[in-house]
Amino acid sequence: MSEMTPREIVHELDSHIIGQHNAKRSVAIALRNRWRRMQLDADFRQEVTPKNILMIGPTGVGKTEIARRLAKLARAPFIKVEATKFTEVGYVGKEVEQIIRDLTDSAIKLTREEQMKKCKFRAEEAAEERILDALLPKAKEDWDNEKPDDSATRQVFRKKLREGQLDDKEIEIDVSAPQVGIEIMSPPGMEEMTNQLQSMFQNMGLGASKRRKMPIKEAYKLMVEEEAAKLVNQDDLKEQAIELVEQHGIVFLDEIDKICKRGEASGPDVSREGVQRDLLPLVEGCTVNTKHGMVKTDHILFIASGAFQMSKPSDLIPELQGRLPIRVELDALSADDFKRILTEPHASLTEQQIALMGTEGVKIEFTEDGIESIAQAAWQVNERTENIGARRLHTVMEKLTEELSYEASDKSGSTIVIDAKYVSDHLDNLVQDEDLSRFIL
């Protein structure tokens, strides 16, 4: 679990996302509150429930990007799902409980990686011994000895192995056969039976080994993973993962506006209102059965987001509105924001283009007025056609550098200056012609 302060979280988000200070503050506080809650005594901790967040803002302003960056910062089980993928129980589509099952799977993966890191030193020692055994088979009379012969020859080979002198030498080793991965599409309500069937098929090949020939460097990596996996206690792993999900899990529900009921149509709508009703128990707290055990959702943090262009937050059913108490509105982006997006974030669009062309030996220089012209062009197209936010910059940038990208291999060693004139020559016709803008930009 991340121990970063809200100020540190916002600072980290600032290096990737321009503006939207209120949204960054809200998610930073929510993330810090997860840590604060864990500092309370156990009895009081149960009473403190997370304050779920609803982010409202037009498309392309950074809602999904905030979620992506938050996942990296949280160091906790995190899952981003599209609300449109789910339907009411009994209809075609995923059940909402699958969200918690997927979250638990991600926690298992996270916990396994942590435990394998702790066992790494012991795993490396065991892998080293296995490789030395393959390089120096024991003499027949030594087979009954429990401890391998630590002779001078073995020490010489151990030294060479550690120094990387034997990396390219090929050896034959026994490696565990990969588990048989079988995907079974289950009808609603039969997930438990499906999980048992999958486990049965996976266990059929368990314990089998396969003899393979490979370079020592590759064999060593494989053996370290194998030995580390042997040292991980599966029961403890599941217990810790479920605890991690229940206390630190974060679910990001994207496109929640698409499951709002629109218009005055009567009767239930299984792919909209039905999904909201199914989401209610998860958000307010229930117990979900997963293949790893029962998971309580009482303290999982839910962050929902939507553009709400065709609907409004009040179109959500009242019960769900009440479970999303913190509302954050994200601002539409201006031409100045576009200019900052092109230059300020880590690995910005201009930096990416410079790096990509650099691989062909072409040097690109973006001038101040050139960047301003690109930002202005993207903003104008957004104003005249559909406003898709910062995503428009990708389209404009690709169109601007299309010819250069095509001919880059023939221009090795040259320097291209992208200034206002260059932008005008390549984009003006498209930007001014509204019909062309609609189809090309």
Curated annotation (Swiss-Prot):
SMART domains named in the record: AAA (SM00382), ClpB_D2-small (SM01086)
Residues spanning the signal sequence: none
CDD domains referenced in this protein's UniProt entry, alphabetically: RecA-like_HslU
Main location as per UniProt: cytoplasm
Any matching Pfam family: AAA_2
Subunit structure: A double ring-shaped homohexamer of HslV is capped on each side by a ring-shaped HslU homohexamer. The assembly of the HslU/HslV complex is dependent on binding of ATP.
Lineage: superkingdom: Bacteria
PANTHER family in the cross-refs: ATP-DEPENDENT CLP PROTEASE ATP-BINDING SUBUNIT CLPX-LIKE, MITOCHONDRIAL-RELATED, ATP-DEPENDENT PROTEASE ATPASE SUBUNIT HSLU
Protein name: ATP-dependent protease ATPase subunit HslU
Protein function: ATPase subunit of a proteasome-like degradation complex; this subunit has chaperone activity. The binding of ATP and its subsequent hydrolysis by HslU are essential for unfolding of protein substrates subsequently hydrolyzed by HslV. HslU recognizes the N-terminal part of its protein substrates and unfolds these before they are guided to HslV for hydrolysis.
